[in-house]
Amino acid sequence: MENNNNAGDTLHPPAAKHDGAAAQANPLSPTRHAKAEEDRKKEEAAASTPTSLEKLAQEIDQFVRRLKTDGNAHNFEIPDFAERYLDLVEEKIMKYDAGEGKPRWGEVSEEDSWLLNNANRFSKLMTLVTGNYPDHEPEKISGAQVSMMNRISSIHQRLMTYLEEDFRFLIEESRIPTELDPGGYNQNSIDTKGKQHMTASEQQQEVAQEQDGLEQDTNFPGYSEETIASLSKIASEMLFGGYESECCQVYIISRRNAFEEINQKLALEKISIDEMVTKVQWETMARDMIPAWINTLKQYAAVYFPGERKLTEAVFANNQAVAAGLFSSLSRGVVIQLLNFAEGAAMTKRAGEKLFKLLDMYESLCQVISNVARLFPDESVEEIKTEMNLAKSRLGEASIHIFCDLENQIKSETAKSAVPGGAVHPLTRYIMNYLSIAGDYKETLEQVFREHTKRDRSGSTSKNAEQKNEGSWDKETPSPFAKQTLRVMDLLDSSLEGKARLYKEVALSNFFMMNNGRYILQKIKSSKEMSKVMGDNWIRKKSSDLRNYHKNYQRETWNRVLQCLNHEGLTVNGKVHKPVLKERFKSFNSLFDEIHKTQSSWVVKDEQLQSELRVSISAVIIPAYRSFVARFAQTFDPGRQTEKYIKYQAEDIETYIDELFEGKPHQSIGKRRT
């Protein structure tokens, strides 16, 4: 112990035990040397003891607040702890770069927090130390300040690069695509192809779900809430740090790829308008491409666009202007692709069979325009509406031209040969089947014609005339669509009258008009919508025309038969004039055979009309024949003479009448049935 004390005295001699002059004369005396050595060791020890990065971060935060409060950042003095803080952050970055790299987001939560906090801290430092000094007075910036600014900028850029990589990883790798939906959306089982199997109430319920189902859905398209929260934090820091462009670019590329996957899944082909017009066969377009387009349009309107807006607003929750711009940019690209397809379809060569597919597209656009437009930011709503309405108008105009072209199709039918057997003409079948289908689109066609007519009137210089026309479409005045349909029907009637004149027999000509008229009337009556279009007056007139054709047919054919059964001129002085009677029976038999032979091959496909004709003929002929035979049969000698002149019994006549109008080749009538 004593030696230790002596040793201690030697290292730290009391000042009173030394002469002051001697000490001054020897500045490297053991006493001063020991004290200097001790101070040096303390400084080295202090320097070698790592200060907590968290503590330094707190001091940096205080430093930043102080600079912000002073508002004069170009006069700051660089504290020693700031240099040390930068050293430690750089060391951490070097470890990331030299080793296995920074852990992926979510693997180490502490690392995620450290990155976010320090990115925020360096963003503030960048703002203060580089943004608060006059650019035109660089001489006021010291070299040390410039050096620190460069270091801060370099570290800040590196931290932002890490955030960008994490953002890309989360937005791309964390998406949860499914086999049915690579975009990761919940589609609520929307399938337009299956709607034909749904009841009306089910369709109404589905429409309601499409309109607001996603607003009640708390799930984001393909991402967990945890991932959304992380994306939002990273986006906030990148935007705060001045890396908005980089963040938005990553987001746009990723979500655009997701949209392309969705389009592939929905079979929406990326095709130019020129290719649609010049290269694609209409059969392919009608069978595959247009149904896929309609389905895609409705899916985007009901599911994908609302989901994308919700996702964008959540990720960029702290900057809704950026969110709105991103959604507008992404969605507008898809909208333009869809509208280009619609315009391409409208520009294809016009043909009758294209009308209803174009109307399907028109209806689909009408259904989604308002819902899609309201998703866009206010400054884009009118532009999107205008573009969608323009595409809709072009589909409407193409539809009008195709429908009006029915007139030309009727006029161009100039065949010079009559339809065998007075059957329904192929032109009649085509036009009426076409109009029957058009009846299913009545409301749409009414809208299309109304809008087209309104545009035509918009150039009128007479305001009063325009107002008069506006109020003229009431229940009693045909709508523009009805007027066009009536023109088509008038042309068809005129065409049929011309074709009826091709028949040499007046009876067959009337039969042809009756047959075709009946087909036309039944087609109109069978369509509730077309009945409304044509109106009660037209139906009554058409029914009256049919009765006249029927009467004319009866008169030209069966009145001649009835004349053979006339009793006049058969008796002289109360006695039957037998030669005249024989001639009457011979005329009846010959005429009936001729009619049966001819009209068995006439064609009536309408079973009801066929039955009505047979009944009406039987009602006229059978009673007259039965009465005639009953009155004069006993005039002939029983046996061969009776069989020679009374060839048929009334029942035979009825049977043969029932063989008329079946369109079958004539078979000779057999002998009288007994």
Each predicted region: which residue ranges?
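Extended, charged coiled-coil "stalk/tether" helices of large eukaryotic trafficking and scaffold proteins
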Residues: N4-L53, Q58-R66, G498-K504, G517-I520, ...
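Eukaryote-specific, cytoplasm-facing alpha-helical/coiled-coil scaffolding segments in long proteins
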Residues: V146-Q157, T161, G184-K195, N257-L266, ...
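Helix-turn/linker elements and helix-coil junctions of extended alpha-helical scaffolds
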Residues: V64-L67, G71, I93, D97-E100, ...
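Eukaryotic N-terminal, low-complexity and coiled-coil-prone scaffolding/targeting segments
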Residues: M1-E363, Q367, E651-T674
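Acidic, Ser/Thr-rich intrinsically disordered and amphipathic helical segments
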Residues: K55, E59-Q62, F81-R84, L88, ...
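Extended alpha-helical solenoid scaffold regions that build the rod-like backbones
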Residues: M276-M530, M534, A624-F628
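Short amphipathic alpha-helical molecular recognition features
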Residues: S48, S52, E77, F81, ...
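Context-gated lysine
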Residues: K17, K35, K41-K42, K55, ...
